[in-house]
């Protein structure tokens, strides 16, 4: 990879009008990549559980693979086994003292296994830095994987978050992402619901402020029969923040009886915010059920009057509503330590915004 190479990332699986500038996102990324710092348990060898996990596609697209090509970059591997009970894997990820860092984790859940993966992206020591991290997940038959990702990078520190996953028969994948940092975020998830009755449930919460950019791409491919996915995205944009959300649900031939739904709620609290949303539902199968919806707007006069009647000004009311939206999500983490970290980070970020 060349130094400061231009990459097209977060591509839509089916192109829309070019003038919308939503088919993909162009970023410049430094090719001089060094291993990121990850505090984790001792790695275990991933089993060959019916597929080569390394070949999975992530939601950020093929061009981003160049970032991870250096053989010296960090690769962690974990396996969850049914006899081990409910397993929790905690990863603290940072660029530390590097300007450009990257790493990968492979996680396989064997048949009937249950595992929770908690990834926290924390600020590096450099004021300007890039962190790219790739997570690949294989959920074996009747297994459950919960992936929880918390972004807390400071302003000037970019995160490229690449997630790829495959779900076997009756497997379940739950993804919860909280973007409560100050830096730009490029987030891509791709999931292959290959097994019959496999499921994906995704919840994303974010706050964008100042000049921050949030660019998200979710691609869910339904292959098996009676598969199910639901996507829920909730966030707030303030000041001159920019956000793009691409949500694609693709019902492949043979996926009869499958269902997919995506919903987004965006609170706009700045005159200069820029919000773009493109829900995409593709069908090659007749007997499927796909839906999408979005609620985008400001606080209405009735809500503001309610707060004003209680002596609460508009700015404070906006902060209360912003925090409430995200509190509902992070309480789904079901890990007391991580919930506390997110609550503290949210308070810190919102306090910074008011300065």
Q: At which residue positions do the language-model features occur?
A:
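Short arginine-rich
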Residues: 326-335
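Small/polar glycine-rich anion-binding or flexible loop at a beta-alpha turn
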Residues: 300-303, 320-327
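Conserved beta-strand/loop scaffold segments within soluble protein domains that form the structured core
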Residues: 5, 58-305, 309-310, 333, ...
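Long, low-complexity, mixed-charge
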Residues: 1-74, 81
């Amino acid at each position: 990879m060349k130094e400061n190479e231009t990459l097209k990332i977060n591509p839509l699986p089916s192109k829309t009008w070019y003038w919308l500038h939503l088919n993909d996102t162009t970023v410049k990324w430094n090719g001089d990549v060094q291993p990121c710092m990850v505090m984790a348990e001792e790695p275990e060898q991933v089993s060959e559980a019916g597929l080569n996990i390394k070949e999975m596609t992530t939601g950020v697209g093929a061009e981003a693979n160049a970032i991870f090509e250096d053989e010296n970059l960090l690769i962690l591997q974990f396996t969850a086994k049914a006899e081990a009970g409910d397993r929790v894997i905690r990863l603290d990820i940072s660029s530390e003292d590097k300007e450009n860092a990257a790493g990968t984790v492979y996680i396989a859940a064997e048949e009937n296994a249950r595992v929770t993966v908690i990834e926290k992206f924390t600020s590096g020591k450099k004021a300007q830095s890039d962190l790219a991290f790739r997570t690949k997940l294989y959920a074996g038959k009747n297994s459950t994987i919960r992936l929880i990702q918390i972004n807390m990078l400071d302003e000037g520190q970019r995160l490229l978050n690449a997630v790829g996953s495959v779900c076997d028969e009756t497997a379940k994948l739950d993804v919860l992402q909280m973007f409560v940092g100050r830096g730009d975020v490029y987030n891509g998830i791709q999931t292959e619901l290959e097994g019959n009755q496999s499921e994906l449930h995704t919840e994303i919460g974010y706050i964008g402020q100042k000049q921050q950019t949030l660019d998200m791409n979710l691609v869910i491919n339904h292959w098996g029969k009676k598969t199910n996915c639901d996507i829920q995205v909730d966030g707030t944009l303030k000041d001159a923040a920019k956000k793009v959300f691409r949500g694609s649900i693709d019902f492949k031939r043979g996926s009869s009886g499958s269902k997919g739904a995506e919903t987004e709620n965006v609170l706009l609290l700045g005159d200069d915010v820029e919000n773009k949303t493109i829900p995409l539902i593709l069908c090659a199968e007749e007997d499927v059920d796909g839906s999408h919806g979005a609620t985008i707007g400001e606080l209405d006069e009735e809500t503001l009057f309610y707060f004003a009647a209680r002596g609460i000004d508009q700015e404070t009311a906006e902060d209360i509503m912003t925090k409430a939206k995200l509190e509902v999500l992070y309480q789904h983490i079901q890990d007391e330590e991580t919930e506390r970290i997110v609550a503290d980070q949210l308070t810190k970020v919102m306090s910074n915004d008011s300065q």
